[in-house]
């Protein structure tokens, strides 16, 4: 709970809902006749609407990226370290929009929402959405907010994929794109981890083919397992070692097979449990699928530089040395393709011990890079506030 | 602007595509893109320099020439590859020189000339590795591991069939004069070469 709102916070924020009664045809061929997107905004849109920045969320993220919902909030939004007055995404300069993606479970239309055509929750019948679908629905939100183009589209991990897709799909509407701790496509190992997570969920006896809602039950054990696997891949060996080492919860070994004995086990259990209480299992399946499917080069015989051809923005690509989910060489692959396609790109490989999660943690070098890039973005804006 | 950079800028044609190895704070690329419509990228490893390039809006890519080389760039992907004051600090300058001419038809290279008379005199008189304005390091903490002279560099170019288009030397005030042009290996402090295959 914040006793006082820190001066570099965006303060108390209120989520908003945008209702769309315009059909959206998805990449899978299915159509959503109506849907809603939950979003938040920070800062003020300037007179010529040129200072808007879009924040795209990662796998389990949502619209609440910065500030607090109330004075009772225990934690600020998920990217509060980077969004606020004086922070890299400076709300004194930029108007920031952050949303919950379609298929999410934080207020945007998703598997847990009521399907207006049946009057029941979509559940597993919610269509598979892709990064491209998200970007298209985000463009509809931009139209609604009367934002003709983004000064920058920014995202980490799965959010970085959306930033990349924006630059390809709507080149005229993106001036800058920051792709952080991301990849142009998942590796087989990445997909394998996602499949383990999905299998954990679908093999929970309470999963009922995704119709757990109708059985008034919930596959929380499976979701917990999925998150535990995911969480291991978000940290590095070093950061886990530093946080927990081989510390025991009790003084002595219990020689029991089922007890939680090591601190790291206890931590994973805690993270898994907390997550399984707050996240929809069908959404988790959906989001990991969107990750698996993303591959803008596929339509160009695997040639990423060809896929990037339409883009007009200036890119920032950032990777972190200990990120083994999307390691630096995945970012370099992207940078090389951008150079080949003669795009404006800058790349920094930030030395951080925090693994994939480093993109959420404000280390000095990372913030310097981000500040440098966003400072230049601000300078480009005519009549910046 | 550093004088070797201000000489180089006159050797770069407008509208060309440039790769600047060890681009520092991006001064040269910033000038070239503002005044000569040059498009380019700088490679750099210093984090302060990378941040400064980002501020300037110069495309900078973090890449260590020693560990990664230039193999991630395709043949002839640039018009010009520039490397100022970095040749002497890399592990394999000869390999790098070939790589530079694989990426572009032309290259510009500047380095401190170890044949400069004051350095020779310093070593002869004191019997110690020279420390000067252009080489301000002691032997144990210098980044310069392959110091060479004007003559050494030309010998390398000769062996590798690299053609020298222009060469010049400047003094520590970064001036050229008739004396250092006459005896460059003895009187030039910084060597500036424009080479091609």
From Swiss-Prot, chain A:
Its EC number is 2.3.1.46. Gene3D superfamilies: 1.10.1740.110, alpha/beta hydrolase. InterPro entries: AB_hydrolase_1, AB_hydrolase_fold, HAT_MetX-like. GO terms for biological process: homoserine metabolic process; methionine biosynthetic process. Its main location: cytoplasm. Residues 51-360 form the AB hydrolase-1 domain. The record marks 325 as: Important for acyl-CoA specificity. Transfers a succinyl group from succinyl-CoA to L-homoserine, forming succinyl-L-homoserine. Belongs to the AB hydrolase superfamily. MetX family. PANTHER family: HOMOSERINE O-ACETYLTRANSFERASE. This is Homoserine O-succinyltransferase.
């Amino acid at each position: 709970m914040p006793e006082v709102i820190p001066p570099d916070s965006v303060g108390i924020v209120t989520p908003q809902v945008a209702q769309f009664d315009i059909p959206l045809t998805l990449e899978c061929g299915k159509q959503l006749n109506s849907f809603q997107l939950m979003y938040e905004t920070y800062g003020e849109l300037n007179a010529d609407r040129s200072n808007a920045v879009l924040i795209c969320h990662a796998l389990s993220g949502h619209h609440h990226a910065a500030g607090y919902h109330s004075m009772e909030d225990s934690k600020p939004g998920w990217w509060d370290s980077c969004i606020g007055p004086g922070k890299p995404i400076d709300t004194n300069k930029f108007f920031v929009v952050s949303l919950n993606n379609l298929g999410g479970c934080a207020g945007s239309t998703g598997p847990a929402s009521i399907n207006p055509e049946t009057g029941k929750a979509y559940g597993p019948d919610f269509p598979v959405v892709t990064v491209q679908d998200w970007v298209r629905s985000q463009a509809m939100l931009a139209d609604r907010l009367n934002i003709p183009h983004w000064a920058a589209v920014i995202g980490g991990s799965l959010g970085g994929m959306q930033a990349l897709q924006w630059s390809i799909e709507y080149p005229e509407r993106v001036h800058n794109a920051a792709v952080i701790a991301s990849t142009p496509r998942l590796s087989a190992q990445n997909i394998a981890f996602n499949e383990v997570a999905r299998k954990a969920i679908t093999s929970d006896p309470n999963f009922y083919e995704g119709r757990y809602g109708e059985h008034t039950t919930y596959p929380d054990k499976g979701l917990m397992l999925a998150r535990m696997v995911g969480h291991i891949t978000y940290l590095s060996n070093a950061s886990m070692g530093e946080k927990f080492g081989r510390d025991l919860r009790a003084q002595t070994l219990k020689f029991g097979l089922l007890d939680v004995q090591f601190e790291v086990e206890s931590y994973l259990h805690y993270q898994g449990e907390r997550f399984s209480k707050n996240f929809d299992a069908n959404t988790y399946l959906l989001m990991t699928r969107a990750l698996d499917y993303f591959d803008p080069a596929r339509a160009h015989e695997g040639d990423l530089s060809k896929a990037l051809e339409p883009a007009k923005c200036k890119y920032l690509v950032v990777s972190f040395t200990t990120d083994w989910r999307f390691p630096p060489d995945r970012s370099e692959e992207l940078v090389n393709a951008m150079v080949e396609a003669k795009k404006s790109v800058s790349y920094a490989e930030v030395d951080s011990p925090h693994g994939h999660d480093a993109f959420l943690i404000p280390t000095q070098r990372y913030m310097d890079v981000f500040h440098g890039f966003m400072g230049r973005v601000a300078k480009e804006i005519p009549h910046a506030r | 602007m550093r004088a070797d950079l201000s000489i180089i800028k006159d050797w770069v044609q407008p509208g060309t595509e440039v790769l600047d190895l060890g681009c520092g704070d991006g001064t040269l690329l910033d000038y070239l893109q503002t005044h000569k419509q040059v498009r380019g990228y700088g490679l750099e490893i210093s984090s302060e320099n990378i941040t400064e390039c980002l501020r300037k809006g110069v495309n900078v890519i973090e890449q260590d020439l020693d560990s990664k080389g230039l193999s991630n760039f395709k043949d002839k992907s640039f018009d010009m590859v520039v490397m100022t004051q970095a040749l002497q600090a890399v592990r394999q300058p000869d390999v790098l020189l070939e790589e530079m001419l694989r990426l572009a038809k032309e290259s510009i290279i500047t380095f401190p000339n170890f044949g400069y008379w004051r350095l020779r005199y310093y070593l002869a008189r004191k019997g110690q590795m020279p420390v000067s304005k252009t080489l301000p390091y002691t032997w144990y903490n210098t980044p310069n591991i392959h110091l060479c002279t004007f003559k050494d560099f030309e010998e390398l170019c000769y062996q590798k069939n690299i053609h020298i288009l222009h060469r010049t030397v400047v003094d520590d005030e970064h001036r050229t004069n008739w004396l250092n042009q006459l005896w460059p290996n003895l009187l030039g402090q910084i060597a500036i070469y424009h080479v091609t295959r």
